[in-house]
């Protein structure tokens, strides 16, 4: 569950 969450957060962080 940590894998998908981290991926989503990474994308959101890049988007700003």
Curated annotation (Swiss-Prot):
Q: Which reactions is this enzyme annotated as catalysing?
A: beta-D-fructose 1,6-bisphosphate = D-glyceraldehyde 3-phosphate + dihydroxyacetone phosphate
Q: Note how many cofactor molecules are bound and how.
A: Binds 2 Zn(2+) ions per subunit. One is catalytic and the other provides a structural contribution.
Which top-rank group of organisms is this from? Bacteria
Pathway linked to the protein: Carbohydrate degradation; glycolysis; D-glyceraldehyde 3-phosphate and glycerone phosphate from D-glucose: step 4/4
Which GO terms fall under molecular function for this chain's record? fructose-bisphosphate aldolase activity; metal ion binding
Needed co-factor(s): Zn(2+)
Q: Which GO terms describe its biological process?
A: glycolytic process
Record EC number: 4.1.2.13
List UniProt keywords, sorted A-Z.
Glycolysis, Lyase, Metal-binding, Zinc
Q: How does it assemble?
A: Homodimer.
Function (record text) = Catalyzes the aldol condensation of dihydroxyacetone phosphate (DHAP or glycerone-phosphate) with glyceraldehyde 3-phosphate (G3P) to form fructose 1,6-bisphosphate (FBP) in gluconeogenesis and the reverse reaction in glycolysis.
Family membership noted in the UniProt record: Belongs to the class II fructose-bisphosphate aldolase family.
* Name the record gives this protein: Fructose-bisphosphate aldolase
The organism is: Anabaena sp. (strain L31)
